From Swiss-Prot:
One of its GO terms (cellular component) is peptidoglycan-based cell wall. This is Universal stress protein Rv1636. Belongs to the universal stress protein A family. InterPro entries: Rossmann-like_a/b/a_fold (IPR014729), Universal_stress_UspA (IPR006015), UspA (IPR006016). GO terms for biological process: response to antibiotic; response to stress. PANTHER family: STRESS RESPONSE PROTEIN NHAX, UNIVERSAL STRESS PROTEIN UP12.
Length: 146
C-alpha cells in the first residue's frame, strides 16, 4: 500500500518526463490518486517562446499537443500499475503550474524527471526540477531518467 494518497507528476512529452510518469504510477499503484499535469502557454500569450524554441515550442505553447501528451502519459501510467489517473492541462509556466496544482490538490508527492526540454528551452524556462524542489511544500521526487 502506498504511503501517498495523491501524487502529482509533470510531463512535457519528453522521454525523461514520461519515465517520471512511469515511476509516479508505480508509486501511486492501485491505492493513490495520480494526477498527470502538463503546463502550456497559449500562443497568443507567449509568441516569444515560439520564436525562441522553434520546433520545440509545441511542448510549451498552444493546446493541441497537450491532450495527446496527456493521453499517452495516462496510458503509460495505467500500464505501470496506476488505477486512479487524472489528466490536467494547465495554462502557465511549468514550475508555477506544478507547485500550485500540488497545493490545490493537497498532494503528498510531486514527481518530475531530472531532464526536461532541450537546452535552449531549459535556459528560457529555467530548471523545472530545481525550481520545483525549492518551491514545493510537499515531498518532491526527482526521477533520474538519463
Amino acid at each position: 500500500m502506498s504511503a501517498y494518497k495523491t501524487v502529482v507528476v509533470g510531463t512535457d512529452g519528453s522521454d525523461s518526463s514520461m519515465r517520471a510518469v512511469d515511476r509516479a504510477a508505480q508509486i501511486a499503484g492501485a491505492d493513490a490518486k495520480l494526477i498527470i499535469a502538463s503546463a502550456y502557454l497559449p500562443q497568443h500569450e507567449d509568441a516569444r517562446a515560439a520564436d525562441i524554441l522553434k520546433d520545440e515550442s509545441y511542448k510549451v505553447t498552444g493546446t493541441a499537443p497537450i491532450y495527446e501528451i496527456l493521453h499517452d502519459a495516462k496510458e503509460r501510467a495505467h500500464n505501470a500499475g496506476a488505477k486512479n489517473v487524472e489528466e490536467r492541462p494547465i495554462v502557465g509556466a511549468p514550475v508555477d503550474a506544478l507547485v500550485n496544482l500540488a497545493d490545490e490538490e493537497k498532494a503528498d508527492l510531486l514527481v518530475v524527471g531530472n531532464v526536461g526540454l532541450s537546452t535552449i528551452a531549459g535556459r528560457l524556462l529555467g530548471s523545472v526540477p530545481a525550481n520545483v524542489s525549492r518551491r514545493a511544500k510537499v515531498d518532491v521526487l526527482i526521477v533520474h531518467t538519463t
